[in-house]
Every structure is written in C-alpha cells, then in structure tokens.
Amino acid sequence: QSGSREVLARVGVALKFALCDGVMYTLDANAALKERTLSGEESELMTGVSDFTLDATGKALLCVTQDGVVSFGIQTGQSEMLYTGAADQAAMCGQALLVRAGGSIVRVMNGQMATIRRDGATCLLVYGQKVIELTGRGVMTCDVNGENATTIANGSYEAASIANGVLYLGGADGYTQSVSL
C-alpha cells in the first residue's frame, strides 16, 4: 500500500500496545502499563503487569498481575479485581471473562468460575462470540461454554493476530498462515 508514515510515539521497548480513542496503551519491559495521548503526555497506570488486553466495549484494560486479573477503567481510572489466581492472559467474550492459566481456559461469569477447555492453550483470543486458542496440536475455536470445539488450523503456532475477520498465525519466521473467521 502507498501512503505516508508518521511516528506517533517513541516508547523504547514495548512488549504490547493497544489504541483506543486516540490514546496508546503500552506494556514495557519493566512490567509497567502506560498511556500516551496524541499530544505526547505519558502517565503510568499500573506496575507489575505481565499482559493486558483492551476491552473496547467496556472501556477497560484487563491487566494480568501476579495476583490475578484486574480491570482498569480507562475513563474512570478505577481498578477492580475480577479474578484471583494464576493467570497468563485474559479477554472478555460478551459478559464472560476468559482467563488462560497453565494451558487451561477458565470462564468467569456471574461470580461463577468454570474451566471450559484443557487443551494446553498457549494463546487466547476472542472474536465476536468465538473463543480461539492456540495449542500444540493446532488452533481451536469454541463457544463461551467450551462447547462446539472445532480445529480451524493444524500445526503449532507461536503467535496470532486478528484483523478484518481474518486470523493470522505465525512464529519466528513471521505470519505464515491465515484463516477467515
């Protein structure tokens, strides 16, 4: 594609970033979650964060810490512990909080916790009402209850990203496969 590029921010080492309403959220190598506005103002929101996911619908950042999963309201600045325990990743799927912990996927909804998948998940993504997990055997989708599981790609992948209804899969050599969702 042709077009011009513009440097929006220089953040040093960013392990992960997300954009919402003109604000960039970054997780740096020191486990600090920061926000940077388009005007260049930067502030530290939380420390001790190992991963985060933007919940654009709920206007919150789901932050994985050593204690569990914290929801940080990006408009209110309020924090709320949503899940206590070991966690590697977190994402919202409708009203359910999904947590990847030790290869399993746990659903938290209405105060009730249930393990919905035990596939050795290495990555958790959500697209619409689909739960997507990378495992050593392939890429699986299921519903929020862990039912209707389907393998959509065979093989082992290290990374996944979703854009415009397409799941991109890859590893050390970059993104090598795509699957329409």
What are these regions (language model features)?
Residues 58-59, 145:
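Short, solvent-exposed loop/turn segments that connect beta-strands within catalytic domains
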Residues 25-26, 62-64, 98-100, 131-133, ...:
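Residue position within the beta-strands of beta-propeller blades
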Residues 16, 27-31, 50, 67, ...:
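Repeated polar recognition positions within modular binding domains
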Residues 1-10, 31-46, 68-83, 103-117, ...:
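Surface-exposed loop/turn elements that mediate protein-protein interactions on large endomembrane-trafficking
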Residues 156-181:
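Blade-level signature of beta-propeller repeat domains, shared across WD40, Kelch, NHL, RCC1
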Residues 1, 20, 29, 38, ...:
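Short loop/turn segments that connect beta-strands within the blades of beta-propeller domains
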